[in-house]
Amino acid sequence: IYHQRAVDAEILIASENYKDALQVYEELFETYEFIFLRDFQIATQLALFLNDEQKSKRLLINGIKSGWKIKSIRNNNFLDKIRKGKDWKSIKKQYHTLNELYESTLNQRLRKRVKKMFSKDQWKAIRALFAFSSKAQDRYAEKKFAPHSEKQISEFLDILNNYGYPGEKLIGNDFWMS
């Protein structure tokens, strides 16, 4: 139901019904314990668009508690109104503490493990680019990539069985397990 309601809000945005879209997001925030960062980001921008600066500040802070990085906030031109507002210095002062709070909710050990798996996959993919001939690519795929993939799948299944899907809620959103 969570994702369906988020889609409902996006449909309202597409039909330029911003006030109702924000209301749908607020209902999501009241109903569910875990909220995806993307939903806080969209709701913050909706509140700004509707000139509700207090609500946008509250949503931005909740977004930071959910992993919204300061660099992303600074690079989002739509958030200029917040960054140029009277509360920005206060938000910046709170950022480190709020980000630490977010980081403390993540399984850091598992995050490192998944990041290492991701790096290994990327390295294998890059190495495959250096097998120039079709025959060399086939040989690499058979001798190196297939065994690597089998190990990765086995480790991924172990993670799924023991922890669940290593997504935004469990390990954060800096990289994706693919």
Where do the PLM segments sit?
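Preference for long, solvent-exposed alpha-helical segments and helix-linker "stalks"
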Residues: 2-37, 48-176
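The feature represents the first ordered module of a protein
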Residues: 40-41, 45
